[in-house]
Amino acid sequence: MIAELRALEPTQLEDFTNSLVDQVVAAVTDKIPHLESSLAVAELTVALHYVLNTPEDVLVWDVGHQAYLHKALTGRMDELANMRKPGGISGFLSRAESSYDFFGAGHASTSISALTGVCLADQIAKRTRHRVAVIGDGSLTGGQSFEALNHLGTLGADVLVIINDNEGSIDPTVGALHNEQSYGTYMQSLGWHYTFLEQGNDVRALVDALQQVLAQPGPQTLHIKTKRPDLSPPKSYKPGTTFQWWAAETVAAIFESTSDIQILSPAMFAGSGFAPLRERYADRLIDTGINEAHTVTTAAGIAAAGGRPWVHIYSTFLQRAFDQIIHDIALQQLPVVFLVDRAGLVGSDGPTHHGVFDADFLMNIPGVTVWSPRNGNELQGMLLEVAARPVAGPLFIRYPKARTEGGTPTDFCTHEWLKKSDGSSLWVSTGALSDLMKNGVNHLHLAQNWPFFDGFGTILSDFEEIHVFEESTGLGGLAGAVKALMAELDHPGKCITHKLPLEFIEHGPRLQLLREHGFNTFL
């Protein structure tokens, strides 16, 4: 399809783009917000592949969620129907899929840094080619993009950064950069030439603009305005069916009875279920932009000033603030509550978004407490507990992107026997995995993963064989902590761990992935 595109006259590009859009819309039935983002840059996608000699020229898409037409143009049209499904292609960019996917992505604000690396490598190799990054105005709020602009602007390399400005990402864009004047002033202050194009959905205008800026030496920015179609109804959660619904409903009740709790989120309120509360509680639900590190240290500042900050953040994005958790919060023992959404396997978003690493790294930080509810009511009990009794240090409440039936309303308790009888074998599990499992002869659910509750070691001593189950990967976490405790107690028994493998797990339905990666016997 690329060869067909490049053989066209400029006057034929609009019809070609419209036909391509129709084919992609007919093929894609999943993740409609990402389809909307892809359609917003339909004309840009066609113009880029028309003007550039990809894959020899470098084209980097930030995040990659907007690359559905890019995939279609580069030989994957027939695979779009199975995108994000088991065995199908990724919903993001993947170097394993195509040479046209120069740099894999899934998280925001990385594209300009990647392009900086390309420029440095090309300097050493004395290689001349076009180098282009496409970044949305939402991703441009991320600190890494500013760091990269600052560095790349000093290299004097021939490079183009295209700012796709549709005034939103998952949530509406926040921050002081909000119009062509502020963008232009900022870019020029960092040594970048700046060009603005209002007609970002006009393929002919885009081709002309690209040809002009690519002919200019040095670092160039092309700021285009685009419009994203609205194809999906407002997101809602059926009452009582998901952890996100339980979190949002409980927070709404807490806000009714308290006035001092503030919740910060790095541009993820739309997926949290909290979005309907933002109009009523604008001063207490604070969108910080795609800035995980900044978000966490801001929460630390609120806590240091005597406030009560909570941070809503996806597990996969918590990784981006690891240093701030240690240096700014844990080291100072500041009372910050983290609502770690999407903990565990997340399904069709795949390896860039699975929340399978945080449990291991959190439990290695001094002074940290980690909770993992098994159902909606337990999550509710946890949130009500921390609202009623302020925490003494950092607390992380991990919950998955999953369905839950709720369970029996209860006050928070650190552990619960799901089944107890005779036998020398003990199952220890945590989180939503506890509710999925067929109960063993003795099955103990740990709502508090860490630190262990008083008396846990005594319970372990009553059993000869300990099975530990957790929906995470790596060598630490709950399983590592149980093994360490057994060694400390000189426990003579055997500890058998059931974890996800130490690998990047592909996309697919959560239950299917669990069954395929070691849990089939127990679910």
Where in the sequence are the language-model features?
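Glycine-rich anion/phosphate-binding loops
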Residues: 317-324
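Conserved glycine-bearing catalytic or ligand-binding loops at nucleotide- and phosphate-handling centers
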Residues: 372-390
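Cofactor-/ligand-binding subdomain signature composed of acidic, glycine-rich
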Residues: 1-27, 186, 232-236
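Proline/glycine-anchored alpha-helix kink/cap motifs
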Residues: 44-50, 115-123, 159-161, 251, ...
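Thiamine diphosphate
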Residues: 82-114, 124-128, 154-234, 245, ...
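Cofactor-binding active-site loop characterized by glycine-rich and histidine/acidic residues
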Residues: 33-155, 261, 274-275
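Active-site cofactor/substrate anionic-group-binding motifs, chiefly glycine-
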Residues: 284-295, 309
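Short, glycine-rich nucleotide/cofactor-binding loops
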Residues: 136-141, 241-242, 291, 313-316
